[in-house]
Amino acid sequence: MSENKKNVDLNKVSYNFGTKGWTVIGFEIVMLFFMTGITVDGLNTIVPMMAAFHGWNPDVLLSISTPASIIALFACVLWAAFIEKAGLKKTTIITMVLAGISMIAYGNSVNIAMYAVSLVCIVTFINAFACNCGFAICANWFPTKKGIVMGITTIGMNLASALINWILSGLSNSFQISGALSILGGVVILLAILLGIFVKATPEEAGCYPDNDPEIAAIIKAEEEGVKEMEKVSYAGALKNKYVWIFGLGAGFFGLATVGIMSQLVSYFMAARGYELTGALSMLTIAAVIGMIGSWAWGVVDQKLGTQKACLLFGIWYFVGIAFLIAPPTPCMYIGLFMLGGAIGGNGNFLPSLAAQVFGRKDFNVSYACMNMINGIVRSCSFFVLAVLRSMTSGYTVPSMVFAVIAVIGGILIVAVKEKKAIQ
């Protein structure tokens, strides 16, 4: 190990990212806000309003969301190839503009077929710019501070959970749902223009150092020079790599547990705890707000302990939190709600951090695309697992504890594989 490496603490928690680094982080927060807000949480408002506006069946509209997500999931794997061919920044801008146009078309759909096609386009392009491209830019800018940066950027997901339905409702009251989605689509296009002006794909292009640290820059330059002649990992190579599969499955188990718990949280508070709908929704909002702190906190744990150890602790935290949530005493329920909120905040942090840890800046795009596909396939099984469990048992205890165990298994899977780092 060189003297440079001996004198640098790669696990140090630091927020000295510089103006341009914080600009990158700010854009990614907003990008993840739109991803979660429009493709997940916003559907609570969009679907019933679109159905009422057009006289369509809301159940039919909602049923389109699942195949749209699956189609987008496989389409997003291909974005790594586009990034290699067109460049990371250009791909980001193009997908943002296409997402904005798709949102405008979505809001102004004249029939269900147009609704379905535009929704597939939205999910595909938003996931492309927020995850495939956005996380790749962050991996380039913050190669050793990935944990804390992912913790900060994923706050955007929780902001969306807390705010998007208020934003959509407010805009719809003035402009109808078609106008609301058109305005938000225009905002995404404006965001693409601003990104084109203020953000570079790598810190070197912006005249900055990775992690805003010249010592880190020297280490990375030496590491990347050592593998310069090696070919970049291919799709086939990534899909043969054990880290891609194990990390994709492990993170997928976290996502499966999160969707399984969150999808029944409102009904749990109403049926098992006696809350009215307004009170149950308030508990959901509280969990989302706590999740903002959780995003940052799990980023700190990731940075200090390493991503794989953080994943194991996350799985255990999830298990204990769910156990408290469903325990009969009311104080236990509040402890569980706090822990669950912290868990949903950290849920989005780990997969891009794991990809950056193992594959570094050079091979992040393809490896993350493949990991994310595996993660998405596992996560999409959540409703099937929930349906099977609910058909076998009554109440919420058994399904909740099964999801809690699944979260622990995810953490064990990730920590069980030998730690590998692109930057030592």
Can you describe what each PLM-predicted range is?
Residues 23-58, 79, 261-266:
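Extracytoplasmic
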Residues 39-50, 236-295:
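Extracytoplasmic gate region of multi-pass secondary transporters
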Residues 75-87, 294-306, 390-391:
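Helix-to-loop junctions at the C-terminal end of transmembrane segments
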Residues 97-110, 317-328:
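C-terminal ends and interior cores of transmembrane alpha-helices
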Residues 113-129, 332-346:
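Hydrophobic core of transmembrane alpha-helices in multi-pass small-molecule transporters
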Residues 128-142, 346-359:
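Intracellular juxtamembrane helix-capping segments at the cytosolic ends
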Residues 161, 358-393:
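A late C-terminal transmembrane helix in Major Facilitator Superfamily
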Residues 285-297, 302-354:
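C-terminal transmembrane helical hairpin of 12-TM major facilitator-type secondary transporters
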